[in-house]
């Protein structure tokens, strides 16, 4: 119908106009998104920005994500070690997986460990150039099996910018 057509055109026009305004507002602002799933990559794409985070295209189970964030700076100094077995058997490993210390990182959007490792290193360096933690945004959802305890722990972390998406019962 013509109504649906107009509604779609308006949505595309509005989206493009909003993005232009938001891009202008963020022009000189570097920000880092640390998410437990691919959400951060979508935000960087929306704004046409380089990935300032190695977590783009990476999934992290709830317990591991809380462990990582609880000692974030120390974990980010660790080296990736690619492995072939996971402690979370819910999902078949048909993608590269690595340990960062004892935290599992699931590179679900990568074909090879070489590609995953190269992008991890490059994006980690880019992330570490953003030294003001007030420009870091942390996001958690239930996509990778976060529990209620994980959400509670997440919101007790000392980071300024946190958001979580919790499913309704």
Can you say where each PLM-predicted feature lies in the sequence?
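Short amphipathic alpha-helical surface micro-motifs
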Residues: 13-17, 118-121, 144-147
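Generic serine detector
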Residues: 1, 14, 50-53, 70, ...
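Positively charged, amphipathic N-terminal segments that serve as targeting/anchoring signals
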Residues: 19-29, 35-140
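Low-complexity, compositionally biased segments
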Residues: 1-3, 13, 39-40, 76, ...
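Conserved binding-pocket/active-site segment within a compact domain
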Residues: 126-169
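Membrane-proximal basic amphipathic "stem/tether" segments
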Residues: 1-27
